[in-house]
């Protein structure tokens, strides 16, 4: 997640020195599909007002433009990368402004334009990629279970969760949710390799790749597919094999607006952490109920409560309230 600096930076960024950077350098190159570490050069530095500066002192926040960068800029629902400039700064977030890939940093040492630096993407990237690939499988599973009328209406992919909005006229039943969840997990177990291709937009559409409605695409697009299960136009980062996703668990299904539903889910380490939290809650419940079978214990308690209520009701009606024996 990025800092308050970016969340409140809309007006500032509108007046930023991006045009000057574009004219001087053009768009910088993203190499993060293949590389998570790189040696790069600082082309430009921007302060909190998005204005060009020659340097950032230690302890300051600002934006950095590298000549080449492994940091993915937030796009297509996928959060921006974090990481570090080795020995120099923590990378808090990465965003795209007018085609420029810029990283928000908090410096540990001074940074200057022209510095040669080493960049490392943080470990969250791998988890984000797993959740992004799981989102593609979820989309495919929804179309398989509910029908091909399903169309993506929005998404958000982070390292510990995913959210997928889609067109559908009514809430999913428990059975439908289970079918979707099971199908995604079955596909994960097949261990299909991911395949990425860059092709002409029309060629991609003819190949059966799913494109987002009303989305503007370049003439050449990136197509991500997993076996014969999923094929979508996507610029995000993904696993190399779907078994890297681990397990997949739907945590919530809800409505967003008329005709739009939302599924929230977790996979990989986040799914394991969720399972552990469920287990901890179950053990706590067993301790509280003094029973190894909490469901039966709850049913027994409900029966006892009903019996006591009946006793109380009868006592009130007979005028014997003061002499109730509840044992």
Predicted regions and their residues:
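A glycine- and charged-residue-rich anion-binding loop/surface
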Residues: 1-327
């Amino acid at each position: 997640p990025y800092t308050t600096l970016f969340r409140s930076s809309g007006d500032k960024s509108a007046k930023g020195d991006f045009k000057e950077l574009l004219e001087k350098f053009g768009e910088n190159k993203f190499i993060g599909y293949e590389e998570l570490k790189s040696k790069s050069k600082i082309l430009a530095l921007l302060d909190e007002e998005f204005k060009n500066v020659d340097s950032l002192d230690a302890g300051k926040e600002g934006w950095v433009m590298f000549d080449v960068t492994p940091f993915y800029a937030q796009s297509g629902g996928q959060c921006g990368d974090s990481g570090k400039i080795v020995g120099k700064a923590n990378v808090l977030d990465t965003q795209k402004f007018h085609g420029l890939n810029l990283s928000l940093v908090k410096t540990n040492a001074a940074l200057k334009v022209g510095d040669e630096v080493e960049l490392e993407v943080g470990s969250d990237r791998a988890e984000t990629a797993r959740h992004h690939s799981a989102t593609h499988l979820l989309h495919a599973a929804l179309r398989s279970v509910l029908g091909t009328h399903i169309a993506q209406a929005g998404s958000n992919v982070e390292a510990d969760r995913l959210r997928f909005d889609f067109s559908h006229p009514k809430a999913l039943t428990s059975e439908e949710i289970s079918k979707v969840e099971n199908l995604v997990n079955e596909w994960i177990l097949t261990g299909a390799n991911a395949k990425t291709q860059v092709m002409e937009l029309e060629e991609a559409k003819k190949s059966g790749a799913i494109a987002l409605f009303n989305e503007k695409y370049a003439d050449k697009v990136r197509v991500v597919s997993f076996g014969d299960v999923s094929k979508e136009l996507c610029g995000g980062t993904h696993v190399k094999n779907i078994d890297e996703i681990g397990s997949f668990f739907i945590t919530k299904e809800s409505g967003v607006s008329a005709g739009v539903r939302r599924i929230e889910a977790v996979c990989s380490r986040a799914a394991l952490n969720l399972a552990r939290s469920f287990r901890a809650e179950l053990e706590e419940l067993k301790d509280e109920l003094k029973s190894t079978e909490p469901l039966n214990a709850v049913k027994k308690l409900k029966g006892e409560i009903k019996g006591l209520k009946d006793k109380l009701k009868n006592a009130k009606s007979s005028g014997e309230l003061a002499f109730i024996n509840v044992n």
